[in-house]
């Protein structure tokens, strides 16, 4: 009996997927999970679109002209697709929040797109791709009955290791706050919280793959809640205490928070858990109570400042970042000065600031009394100068201090590594230490958005 010669067996060439990710950390997580899902169909990730058999654009709808940016990118992909030969066809898909908002309009304006799926549907991606192979165009933007997270495969350990020692983990999705400037409730849907069991299992998978730092994600992450076996309801603070006990995990973070859901148990976690990093992104958007009301933020500036004080009392070394919108409809010079006043009171380590732009479908888009663009520009410049001054002051304040740094990747130069400080900023240090190591580092200097350090003498 002749045995088959494995050398004569033709090898199966894996299909390649390229995912371009726009926007927030949750989109990064979603792209990673889509890659994991597609691995069951023989796809491997590629960093080069020209090599790809499948290109997915995982879109964000938060900023102005998000849809036009998508159509511009699709125009370039159309040219790429036309240049392909018959033996190297290219499939194109649009996912994420612009897909949710635009739906069939994407196929109308870009007929070469094969599938359009919203952020709640990507667990069905492998099956939907099979349908496109039969020439069917797919648009799936409904909210499914099933729990998408329950239908995702386990993390691919090899892929996790390649991504590094820090990882995102979505625990909450959607938003019920309906801020008048924001599209998230319309593109991500109502707030849902994943179960403690699901979150714990996924965290364990990440840790087993070598992850040392996990950032919990949610559009309103501190709105997370879940029931445990005895029927008791947990909030995010309880979840953090629970995850802090997992063997092998060295650091925890979470983002993005709403001031309304920043409760005492969560503040206590900042006080009690060394594993919870002293950094908090807590957007406020405006310092004017009148504008906060128009934005439907459901709190006043004094409430926000009181929270900042309570959190700093619990964790004195904490650094705050925030979000600010200038030029919201009806914003006066006095309103803007209230924002400047709040920023000076808080003293941020970093912050994001933007000009208001109306998002289709939001209440803000129907408001009158819009602020002149030149006024918006001037206010934004004023704000960014102030915020940059605060960022530089924060960076300088850490020079001479010694802090723990998580080594994440190889640096640009030989013998150099880059790590992550407790305040999220990168630290460059000369060391041969392995990734995943937490080292005591003396901060020698600071750049515009990073530190330079050396191994501390212990």
Curated annotation (Swiss-Prot):
Its cofactor is [4Fe-4S] cluster. Residues 396-457 form the TRAM domain. The keyword tRNA processing applies. It holds the Pfam family UPF0004. The keyword S-adenosyl-L-methionine applies. Its EC number is 2.8.4.3. CDD domains: Radical_SAM. SUPFAM superfamilies: Radical SAM enzymes (SSF102114). One of its GO terms (cellular component) is cytosol. [4Fe-4S] cluster 1 binds at residues 24, 60, 97. This is tRNA-2-methylthio-N(6)-dimethylallyladenosine synthase.
């Amino acid at each position: 009996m002749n045995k088959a010669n494995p050398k004569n067996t033709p090898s199966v060439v894996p299909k390649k997927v390229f995912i371009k990710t726009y926007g927030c950390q949750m989109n990064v997580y979603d792209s990673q999970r889509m890659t994991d899902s597609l691995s069951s169909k023989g796809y491997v990730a590629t960093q080069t679109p020209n090599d790809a058999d499948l290109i997915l654009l995982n879109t964000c709808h938060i900023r102005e002209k998000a849809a036009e940016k998508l159509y511009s990118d699709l125009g370039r992909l159309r040219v790429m697709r036309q240049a392909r030969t018959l033996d190297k066809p290219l499939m194109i898909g649009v996912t994420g929040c612009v897909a949710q908002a635009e739906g069939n309009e994407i196929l109308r304006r870009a007929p070469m797109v094969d599938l359009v799926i919203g952020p709640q549907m990507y667990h069905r991606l492998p099956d939907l791709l099979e349908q496109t192979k039969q020439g069917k165009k797919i648009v799936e933007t409904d909210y499914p009955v099933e729990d998408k997270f329950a239908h995702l495969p386990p993390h691919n350990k090899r892929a996790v290791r390649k991504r590094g020692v820090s990882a995102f983990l979505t625990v909450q999705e959607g938003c019920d706050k309906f801020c008048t400037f924001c599209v998230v409730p319309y593109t991500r849907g109502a707030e849902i919280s994943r179960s403690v069991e699901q979150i714990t299992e996924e965290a364990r998978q990440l840790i087993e793959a070598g992850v040392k730092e996990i950032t919990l994600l949610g559009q309103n992450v501190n709105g997370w809640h879940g029931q445990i076996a005895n029927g008791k309801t947990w909030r995010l603070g309880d979840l953090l205490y629970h995850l802090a006990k997992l063997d092998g995990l060295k650091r925890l973070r979470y983002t993005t928070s709403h001031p309304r859901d920043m409760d005492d148990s969560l503040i206590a976690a900042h006080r009690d858990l060394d594993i919870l990093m002293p950094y908090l992104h807590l957007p406020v958007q405006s310092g004017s109570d009148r504008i906060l009301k128009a934005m439907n933020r459901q709190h006043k500036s004094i409430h926000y400042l009181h929270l900042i004080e309570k959190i700093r009392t619990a964790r004195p070394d904490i650094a705050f970042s925030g979000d600010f919108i200038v030029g919201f409809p009806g914003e006066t010079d006095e309103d803007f000065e209230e924002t400047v006043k709040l920023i000076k009171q808080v003293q941020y380590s970093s912050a994001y600031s933007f000009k208001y732009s109306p998002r289709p479908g939001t209440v803000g888009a129907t408001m009158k009394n819009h602020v002149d663009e030149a006024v918006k520009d001037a206010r934004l410049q004023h704000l960014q100068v102030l915020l940059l001054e605060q960022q530089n002051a924060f960076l300088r304040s850490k020079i001479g201090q010694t802090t723990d740094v998580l080594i994440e990747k190889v640096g640009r130069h030989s013998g150099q590594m880059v790590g992550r400080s407790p305040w999220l900023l990168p630290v460059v240090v000369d060391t041969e230490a392995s990734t995943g190591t937490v080292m005591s580092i003396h901060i020698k200097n600071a750049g515009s958005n990073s530190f330079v350090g050396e191994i501390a003498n212990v």
